[in-house]
């Protein structure tokens, strides 16, 4: 009588080698999750920030001030900031009359915003096409929390005008002299800005007085 042959598949243990891989696996499919690449690390910022743009081409003489300001994008990490910054026009590329803002999330760059209402702004000026570096260093100082009174800061705006460009840092409480003077001095040092700069209170600016004076100067 012929010897009966065992046709059952051999187990992995019976042959001392691993079982064959599933033939149904698609080409390129990762079966071992331990080998999958980790998502790139991100570096969260202390605050989220929003870019805003005020397009002069959408303004009309009858429109209320600030009605043409629109939010562009909010970022919360270092990586998101650079992704945005590297893909937007820098001040030297903006058209005359444009205003580009970077404010803490949920603070609108308007005098009427409750957080801005009692504040003011420090302003520097430079020639046309000269503000790109100042603007970048201002942004990095703000989002990187380099100011001793960083909680007092609402945001910053760069304004492109016919003969010059202006950058301003907006703050919350104009009456807090120690905080405002500290911010002004640190800002000048960070930018290595040699000229004097002045602090204007928003309530004073609303009066449109040609004889408007700085509340503080550094």
Curated annotation (Swiss-Prot):
Subcellular localization(s) per the UniProt record: Nucleus; Cytoplasm
UniProt GO MF annotations: RNA 7-methylguanosine cap binding; RNA binding; translation initiation factor activity
InterPro entries, from UniProt?
TIF_eIF4e-like, TIF_eIF_4E, TIF_eIF_4E_CS
Q: Does the keyword Nucleotide-binding apply?
A: no
Q: Which domain of life is it from?
A: Eukaryota
Q: Which Pfam families match?
A: IF4E
Q: How is it modified after translation?
A: According to the redox status, the Cys-116-Cys-154 disulfide bridge may have a role in regulating protein function by affecting its ability to bind capped mRNA.
Q: What induces it?
A: Induced by ethylene (ETH), jasmonic acid (JA) and salicylic acid (SA), mainly in lines (e.g. cv. Ye478) susceptible to potyvirus such as maize rough dwarf virus (MRDV).
Q: Which SUPFAM superfamilies match?
A: eIF4e-like
SS bond list:
116-154
- Tell me the segments the record calls region Disordered: 1-39
Role this protein plays = Component of the protein complex eIF4F, which is involved in the recognition of the mRNA cap, ATP-dependent unwinding of 5'-terminal secondary structure and recruitment of mRNA to the ribosome. Recognizes and binds the 7-methylguanosine-containing mRNA cap during an early step in the initiation of protein synthesis and facilitates ribosome binding by inducing the unwinding of the mRNAs secondary structures.
Q: Into which family does the record put it? A: Belongs to the eukaryotic initiation factor 4E family.
Q: What is said about its interaction partners and assembly?
A: EIF4F is a multi-subunit complex, the composition of which varies with external and internal environmental conditions. It is composed of at least EIF4A, EIF4E and EIF4G. EIF4E is also known to interact with other partners. In higher plants two isoforms of EIF4F have been identified, named isoform EIF4F and isoform EIF(iso)4F. Isoform EIF4F has subunits p220 and p26, whereas isoform EIF(iso)4F has subunits p82 and p28.
Q: What is this protein called?
A: Eukaryotic translation initiation factor 4E-1
Report the source organism: Zea mays
Q: What is the lineage of its organism?
A: Eukaryota, Viridiplantae, Streptophyta, Embryophyta, Tracheophyta
Q: Which gene encodes it?
A: eIF4E1
